[in-house]
């Protein structure tokens, strides 16, 4: 009986070890919207560029010292980005001016500095929100609201991509593919991949009539989000199977 008990405990221990993940993800978001985490200095000169770079280096050193191993680096903010893109324009937070080239590639620099420290970099993409009236005005002709207005809806004072329009999956997957194909990222992280708060009033009746196929509205909306995520996942994995795809969901939406 004692031998049997020891044997069962041994098997239980083995099963417990097998259930443990091979690698624990210890991640943090690094927010670039409004320079909330970075950058606090604008890249309007060689000195400003150097200050931006040094500030990021200090933050990454601190994360490494705190035993983090993954940085979720905000790469798409509100209809703008922090790398030279053929799809969207440079974010205001880099230089203080929307669309202005900062004189270097912040995403490439962040990837290189993360990898020097053994940190993974996952490109964090804010998916559905585009921005409020001021942000959209600053983006001007480069904004998706101007370039592809059929994809966009105004709701509660802000603009959003319409998840029910199949073109939204096309648009977001293009951004994810552009980043994945051009950069040595370790992951794509999807944020705000959902309808906005109070989304039951989202103005998508026309889209629902066109694409709903007599499906119940709430289920149709859930399926729209699932299709976008599945599309991005499949196309990222087709380009680079080792790149991880994750999201920041909120259960009540």
Language-model-detected regions and their locations in the chain:
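Bacterial Sec-dependent N-terminal signal peptides
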Residues: 1-21
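Glycine-rich, aromatic-flanked loop segments that form ligand/cofactor-binding clefts
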Residues: 22-28, 68-78, 106-152, 189, ...
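Active-site-adjacent "subsite" loops/lids of carbohydrate-active enzymes
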Residues: 23-25, 31, 35-53, 123, ...
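Active-site beta-loop-alpha junctions enriched in small/polar residues
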Residues: 30-35, 76-78, 126-128, 192-195, ...
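N-terminal post-signal-peptidase region of extra-cytosolic proteins
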Residues: 45-59, 94-107, 174
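Catalytic domains of carbohydrate-active enzymes, especially glycoside hydrolases
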Residues: 54-80, 183-185
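Polysaccharide-binding and catalytic clefts of secreted carbohydrate-active enzymes
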Residues: 69, 117, 140, 145-253
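Aromatic-lined substrate-binding rim segments of carbohydrate-active enzymes
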Residues: 73-126, 217-232, 236
């Amino acid at each position: 009986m004692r031998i049997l008990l020891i044997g069962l405990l041994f098997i239980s221990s083995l099963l417990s070890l097998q259930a443990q993940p091979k690698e624990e993800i210890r991640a943090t978001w690094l927010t670039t919207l409004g320079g909330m985490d970075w950058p606090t200095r604008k890249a309007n000169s060689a000195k400003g560029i150097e200050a931006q770079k040094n500030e990021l280096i200090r933050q990454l050193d601190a994360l490494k010292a705190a035993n983090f191993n993954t940085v979720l680096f905000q790469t798409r903010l509100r209809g703008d980005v922090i790398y030279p893109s053929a799809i969207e324009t440079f974010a205001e937070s880099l230089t203080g001016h929307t669309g202005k080239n900062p004189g270097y590639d912040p995403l490439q620099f962040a990837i290189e500095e993360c990898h020097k420290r053994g940190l993974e970099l996952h490109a964090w993409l804010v998916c559905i929100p585009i921005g409020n009236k001021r942000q959209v005005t600053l983006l001007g002709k480069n904004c998706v609201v101007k370039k592809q207005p059929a994809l966009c809806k105004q709701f509660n004072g802000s603009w959003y991509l319409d998840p029910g329009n199949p073109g939204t999956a096309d648009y977001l997957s293009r951004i994810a593919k552009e980043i994945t194909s051009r950069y040595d990222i370790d992951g794509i992280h999807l944020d705000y991949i959902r309808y906005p708060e109070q989304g039951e009033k989202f103005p998508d009746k026309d889209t629902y009539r066109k694409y709903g196929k007599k499906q119940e509205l709430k289920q149709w909306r859930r399926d729209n989000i699932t299709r976008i995520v599945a599309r991005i996942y499949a196309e990222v994995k087709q380009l680079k199977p080792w790149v991880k795809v994750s999201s920041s969901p909120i259960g009540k939406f």
